[in-house]
Amino acid sequence: MKPHLKQWRQRMLFGIFAWGLLFLLIFIYFTDSNPAEPVPSSLSFLETRRLLPVQGKQRAIMGAAHEPSPPGGLDARQALPRAHPAGSFHAGPGDLQKWAQSQDGFEHKEFFSSQVGRKSQSAFYPEDDDYFFAAGQPGWHSHTQGTLGFPSPGEPGPREGAFPAAQVQRRRVKKRHRRQRRSHVLEEGDDGDRLYSSMSRAFLYRLWKGNVSSKMLNPRLQKAMKDYLTANKHGVRFRGKREAGLSRAQLLCQLRSRARVRTLDGTEAPFSALGWRRLVPAVPLSQLHPRGLRSCAVVMSAGAILNSSLGEEIDSHDAVLRFNSAPTRGYEKDVGNKTTIRIINSQILTNPSHHFIDSSLYKDVILVAWDPAPYSANLNLWYKKPDYNLFTPYIQHRQRNPNQPFYILHPKFIWQLWDIIQENTKEKIQPNPPSSGFIGILIMMSMCREVHVYEYIPSVRQTELCHYHELYYDAACTLGAYHPLLYEKLLVQRLNMGTQGDLHRKGKVVLPGFQAVHCPAPSPVIPHS
């Protein structure tokens, strides 16, 4: 009996020793990980987007794929105004002072690294000696894709059981090297679903200087651009020349002579036969302010405008243009509360979630609607098959509110703007209409002597947050996928007459209105004798 008891005790002691060794190895394994690093997830980009608590109403991003919002989503107004998503370029008072001490904002590298480096799980890849972020979803580390120092589902984790000490040490060394390598180089095998930070500090700096190209975009956006070029949904047949050699004065004169605002006036088929001549406003949009407006503001809906404290400055302008469903209530400190004109895409009129009929956002303001039409600007074809049927709600609204100025932009005006962008860009741009932002800028340039545009070209507060009033992140909202946004911004940057300080700190571009542009008279044609 005693020998059996002795063997049992030996086995028990051996088991205790084995379990103790196992727990020791597990403790060493996990304490080797850097606690400062965010824990990544193996979720793909699409899965990450589905898990985000997007605001209940549908996003009005023209051409974007819309996804149903999960029930019980967070209210953006509660979640956003004072939140700084990780990976965003938020600048506090101390940062702005540091920025002002630097001539171009990049003599002190810690200015940006303090904003991004510790907050976003980033990977970089080199492009023309610059490094671009491949970060996880800002502000949502638990939904971030990546393998920074942790095994992914495709990699085997540690086996259960005891490892020899030498093997454990080798694993620790390999793990540390792998983590360091992955934090600096983007793996070539990564697919296009990885969510990238919208831009690195180097890219933002080059955007301010007007020195970027589509080749510097992340692979996901590059693929989207190529797909749109291949699809050519609107049948674009560009026959002009692509060049970018015009000076600012020449470009302004080109815009003044060719980018003339035009709306449906009811005189063309099929609208003439439908009685639209009596339906549309009697006074054209271009003649609402015959004497012109002195100073105007165009306020983008970009998330970067949060925490800007620009509201008072914006409201000081004679007229303010806003976009789609962007609210002012609750955001007055950053965006102001004055609204003179509101540009709305056709989704606003057709999607019930925007409450176009009864929302106060669309009352007591000038409304300008638009819808993507064929490049040929064939009105009959467009009327039969619009992107979103804005014609029926337009008729209903005009009948109920005959005194409210409400216009639909003519497709020829929209595609004329696209032609000008393409003519002044060496690369092929997406064959899709310009964004509402670019359209709004040109409308205000036709009505005002000076136009101040806020957060079209992003400031140091640059973030992937698409809109300040919606909890939705995507780099495409800043750099473009459907719209040729990148090329629009480069064109506007060439026209900027404001200071670099305003561009950096406020995201503000100052443009002359067409009334203030003086162009040489065209040379008379001398007939041959």
Curated annotation (Swiss-Prot):
- An example Gene Ontology molecular-function term: beta-galactoside alpha-2,6-sialyltransferase activity
Q: What class of enzyme is it?
A: transferase
GO CC, alphabetical:
Golgi apparatus; Golgi cisterna membrane; Golgi membrane
Instruction: List membrane-spanning regions.
Output: 12-32
InterPro entries of this UniProt entry? Glyco_hydro/deAcase_b/a-brl, Glyco_trans_29, GT29-like_sf
Q: Which residues are glycosylated?
A: S69, N211
Principal subcellular localisation of the protein: Golgi
Q: Which domain of life is it from?
A: Eukaryota
Provide the disulphide bond pattern: C253-C519, C296-C448, C466-C477
Answer whether the UniProt record assigns the keyword Cell membrane to this protein: no
CDD domains in UniProt: GT29_ST6GAL2
Outline what the protein does. Answer: Transfers sialic acid from the donor of substrate CMP-sialic acid to galactose containing acceptor substrates. Has alpha-2,6-sialyltransferase activity toward oligosaccharides that have the Gal-beta-1,4-GlcNAc sequence at the non-reducing end of their carbohydrate groups, but it has weak or no activities toward glycoproteins and glycolipids.
Q: What is this protein's name?
A: Beta-galactoside alpha-2,6-sialyltransferase 2
Record the organism: Homo sapiens
Please name the taxonomic classification of the source. Answer: Eukaryota, Metazoa, Chordata, Craniata, Vertebrata
